[in-house]
Amino acid sequence: MAADCPAAGREPGAWRVQEEAGSRTLWETACVDVRDSANPVLVGARRWLARVNARHPWNHNEHFHGWILRNLPARRRAAVDVGCGTGVLAGKLAPHFARVTGIDADEGMAAAAGARLAQDPRVSIRHCRFEQFAAEAGDGQTDLITMVAVLHHLDLEDTLARIPGLLAPGGRLLVVGLARADSLPDLAADLISATANPVMGLIRHPRPARQAGGPAPGQPVMPVRDPATTLAEITAAATARLPGATVRRRLFFRYTLRWDKPPVTAPPPGSRNPATTR
């Protein structure tokens, strides 16, 4: 969901490091001061970053669509885009799959996606919650499930627990998500991202925008929620629920998660299935 882009205007609280034993390291203090300090130089730098980002906006989530398209599963019958927003990713997946389903809990988002993709018979859009969809479609026939900036809107443990039942053997889950900064590596990645963000904006959107970023006239506003779970918590949940999952910290305030459901392997010739042997 494009609105979940912290960029340089993110709330200072997301950058705070909790004190341990009543003291902070020099690095921790620096991280806090960069975001919260009333120093005129730092205040000016933050305002400059905000102005540059506003003049040269770009979509953090769509930036990772290429990663998704480069990691499609071998079998491509059915794909489900959870939290499809206005349907941009669902439209990009359509040429690669026999059918694509986009779901969104927000009525305005689902309506916008439906209007965008109304002429594509390969794509269907549903206005429903993920839990409802999973309960109705848990038949293990989906080859790809994508979630872009949506997992932090859902219950982490419950959502990950439902994935194996939805995916076909050999199916794949691809997540681009947001996590709460809670460690020095998190803060370092966020500081680098905040610095690189305007550079990427200049590259991808060199012509200054005439107006501040936001939805186009008549377009619904993306639902926004700050992430509550840390990358360490997400990794632990994925390890428990989806053995073999790969979680990686990325630039531009994102992480990626990839998991492949194990394929069904045929037993060797002459072997017996212990569950059915009498």
Model features per residue range: what roles?
Residues 154-163:
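A short, conserved alpha-helix within the catalytic core of class I
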Residues 77-85, 174-203:
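Conserved class I S-adenosyl-L-methionine
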Residues 224-243:
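Short alpha-helix
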Residues 167-172:
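Short glycine-dipeptide loop
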Residues 86-132:
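Class I SAM-dependent methyltransferase SAM/SAH-binding core
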Residues 146:
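A conserved beta-strand element that flanks and buttresses the S-adenosyl-L-methionine
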Residues 59-77:
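Conserved alpha-helix/loop element of class I SAM-dependent methyltransferases that forms part
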